[in-house]
């Protein structure tokens, strides 16, 4: 299983062009996705369904590294959404409390956001 996770992380980071600093977020997302799909170890049942005894939802899943716009309330005449650098902000993962981790720009650290528009 460890090799599977590492391979998914490597491919996710290569596909969207994110730096290695996002490895932990990519690993978290990879494990989250693995737990949402059927597993041969438990007779093709979904691990989340077995653990929580309810059908998992997939509607919130987005492509790793897609462009995301954070809703801002900085003032009446200021822009209502922030986008990262030219490559875009990076949507990393949806967390249990309906927060997304967003990395904006090259130097800023990832932020958590709940009000955002997602493109892609």
Swiss-Prot record:
InterPro entries recorded: Retrotran_Ty1/copia-like, RNaseH-like_sf
PANTHER family: TRANSPOSASE, PUTATIVE-RELATED, TRANSPOSON-ENCODED PROTEIN WITH RIBONUCLEASE H-LIKE AND RETROVIRUS ZINC FINGER-LIKE DOMAINS
Keywords assigned: Mitochondrion
Source organism superkingdom: Eukaryota
Subcellular location(s) per record: Mitochondrion
Protein name listed in UniProt: Uncharacterized mitochondrial protein AtMg00710
GO cellular component, one term: mitochondrion
Natural source organism: Arabidopsis thaliana
Residues forming coiled coils: none
């Amino acid at each position: 299983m460890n090799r599977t996770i590492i391979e998914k992380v490597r491919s996710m980071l290569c596909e969207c062009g994110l730096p290695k600093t996002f490895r932990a977020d990519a690993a978290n997302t990879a494990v989250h996705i693995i737990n949402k799909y059927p597993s041969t170890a438990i007779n093709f049942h979904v691990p989340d369904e077995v653990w929580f005894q309810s059908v998992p939802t997939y509607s919130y899943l987005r492509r790793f590294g897609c462009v995301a716009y954070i809703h801002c309330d900085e003032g009446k005449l200021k822009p209502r959404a922030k986008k990262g650098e030219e490559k875009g902000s990076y949507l990393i993962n949806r967390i249990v409390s309906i927060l997304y981790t967003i990395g904006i720009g090259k130097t800023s650290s990832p932020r958590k956001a709940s009000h955002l528009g997602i493109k892609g």
